[in-house]
């Protein structure tokens, strides 16, 4: 399928046209784009949520149609962006889906919705013996569960119970740096304890630029103001620094963040 963000020579679609494209079931490319568009444009059309929820139904088919699966994944993402509380029950059920990507996107969207009822479901995905948490799936680099998105979701939801903190802590020692970063981000958000920040800042010095980028965005998401100098000095693209700084600005009235953003423009 064509990338939804790809430019083309066609005139822009209206919201009504997009709704009709998602409603019809013959052209999967139109459905795929429509599901993406409704999230991207923060649609408040009364039919947006019902149609996006209906697009999830094929995920329960066995076998699942590949193109319907792609539409459903875009619908999951859109429901998160739209913070659709009416989708919580459906998204929670999808955390038990056999498809890794479905679980990953559902966890991420539940975090965006801040679905407190999903905390126990998310914690169950983090359970397991230490060796299980490190073990990759057969023939794949993927681990047993999408730990990054689950950890980030728990941080975003904000339930700082002792049981949640306890289940997150082991992931700060995980062998994969981005999983460590997600755990540190979650703990910094949930506890406000500065002890979780230095290991996250250290990842800004990692040799792998992907890890530096991930750590930068995680720091920004925490809103932890003392991270400002490290974010400014990070060897990362200015466009990503702006995203991280915006995260700080959204949680602070300190004008030095805005000054740092202006300096990058």
From Swiss-Prot:
GO CC annotation, single: phycobilisome
Entry keyword annotation includes Lyase: yes
SUPFAM superfamilies associated with the record: ARM repeat
One Pfam family per UniProt: HEAT_PBS
Family to which this protein belongs: Belongs to the CpcE/RpcE/PecE family.
PANTHER family tied to this protein: DEOXYHYPUSINE HYDROXYLASE (PTHR12697:SF5), PBS LYASE HEAT-LIKE PROTEIN (PTHR12697)
Role, per record: An enzyme involved in the biosynthesis of bilin. Might be involved in the specific attachment of phycoerythrobilin (PEB) to the R-phycocyanin II beta chain.
Protein name: Bilin biosynthesis protein RpcE
UniProt source species: Synechococcus sp. (strain WH8020)
């Amino acid at each position: 399928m064509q990338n939804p963000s790809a430019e083309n020579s066609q005139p822009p679609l209206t919201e009504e046209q997009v709704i009709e494209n998602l409603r019809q079931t013959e052209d999967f490319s139109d459905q795929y784009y429509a599901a993406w568009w409704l999230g991207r444009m923060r649609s408040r059309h009364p039919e947006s949520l019902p149609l996006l929820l209906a697009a999830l139904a094929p995920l329960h088919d066995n076998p699942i149609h590949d193109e319907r699966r792609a539409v459903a994944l875009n619908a999951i993402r859109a429901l998160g962006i739209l913070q659709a509380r009416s989708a919580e029950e459906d998204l929670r059920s999808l955390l038990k889906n056999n498809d890794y990507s479905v679980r990953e996107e559902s966890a991420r969207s539940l975090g965006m919705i801040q679905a407190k009822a999903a905390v126990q479901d998310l914690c169950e995905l983090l359970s397991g013996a230490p060796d299980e948490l490190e073990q990759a799936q057969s023939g794949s680099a993927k681990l047993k569960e999408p730990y990054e998105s689950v950890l980030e979701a728990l941080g975003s939801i904000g339930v700082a119970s002792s049981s949640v903190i306890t289940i997150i802590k082991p992931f700060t020692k995980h062998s994969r740096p981005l999983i460590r970063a997600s755990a540190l981000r979650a703990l910094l958000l949930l506890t406000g304890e500065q002890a979780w920040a230095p290991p996250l800042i250290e990842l800004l010095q990692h040799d792998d630029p992907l890890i530096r980028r991930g750590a930068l965005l995680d720091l920004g998401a925490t809103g932890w103001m003392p991270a400002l100098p490290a974010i400014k000095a990070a060897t990362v693209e200015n466009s990503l620094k702006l995203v991280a700084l915006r995260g700080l600005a959204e949680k602070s009235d300190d004008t030095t963040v805005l000054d740092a953003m202006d300096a990058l423009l």
